[in-house]
């Protein structure tokens, strides 16, 4: 059956959008990369036949453009697109956690963000999400503007932490004045997030206030 005859909700792209990539089979993901079928075969049929011919994704990854182009309905352009996607997956796999930045001290955290944040003209509130080895998994800008406890919603911060499977996190924000002395709001936000982290089990390790080539650690100041 041609893809246009499939119910809308059963088409790979629509299922990808609705349920996410993990809900699709290998041949459905390959079909998305191949994009189109022929007059006689749907792209899903071509995808399934391609995987069957080579015996699975691993063998497809090792195939040449010429070998893949021999599959009816594929051609060089589709072969290149598929091999490029598989190569990206291979490269991502080889990027081990050993290459991630490690934060062991407040200085490590400040060095990670200083050059990006010291000259910002507005306050940026950023979270650094870490794994169990204190390696940075993700840097996320929570909001831009004056820091206020009513604006910083723990829900948004911990939602991102769960998404990244973080074990802990560090909050960072800048003072455009260049003076990193923490304000009352800075301290209140820090203590609120620290208490939430204790309940949820994702620890706030520190809150760094960035100035011009200097910073303050609220942990070192005794607020955590």
Curated annotation (Swiss-Prot):
Q: Name one GO biological process term.
A: proteolysis
What Pfam families does its record include? RadC, UPF0758_N
- Give TM segment ranges: none
Q: What InterPro entries does its record include?
A: MPN (IPR037518), RadC_JAB (IPR025657), RuvA_2-like (IPR010994), UPF0758 (IPR001405), UPF0758_CS (IPR020891), UPF0758_N (IPR046778)
Q: Where is Zn(2+) annotated to bind?
A: 173, 175, 186
Which SUPFAM superfamilies does this one have?
Answer: JAB1/MPN domain (SSF102712), RuvA domain 2-like (SSF47781)
Locate the motif JAMM motif: 173-186
Listed name of the protein: UPF0758 protein BPUM_2444
**Organism from which the protein derives:** Bacillus pumilus (strain SAFR-032)
């Amino acid at each position: 059956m041609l893809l246009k005859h499939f119910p809308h909700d059963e088409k790979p792209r629509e299922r990808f959008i609705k349920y996410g990539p993990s809900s699709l089979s290998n041949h459905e993901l390959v079909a998305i990369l191949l994009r189109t079928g022929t007059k006689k075969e749907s792209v899903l049929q071509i995808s399934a036949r391609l995987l069957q011919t080579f015996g699975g994704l691993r063998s497809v990854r090792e195939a040449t453009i010429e070998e893949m182009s021999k599959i009816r309905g594929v051609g060089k352009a589709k072969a290149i697109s598929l091999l490029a996607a598989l190569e990206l997956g291979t490269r991502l796999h080889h990027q081990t956690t050993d290459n991630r930045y490690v934060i062991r001290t407040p200085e490590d955290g400040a060095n990670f963000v200083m050059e990006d944040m010291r000259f910002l003209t507005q306050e940026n509130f950023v979270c650094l999400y870490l794994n169990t080895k204190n390696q940075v998994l993700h840097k996320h800008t929570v909001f831009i503007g004056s820091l206020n406890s009513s604006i910083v919603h723990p829900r948004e911060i911990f939602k991102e932490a769960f998404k990244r499977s973080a074990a802990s996190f560090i909050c960072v924000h800048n003072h455009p004045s260049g003076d990193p002395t923490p304000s009352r709001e800075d301290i209140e936000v820090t203590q609120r997030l620290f208490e939430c982290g204790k309940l949820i089990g994702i620890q706030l390790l520190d809150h760094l206030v960035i100035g011009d080539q200097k910073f303050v650690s609220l942990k070192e100041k005794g607020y955590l």
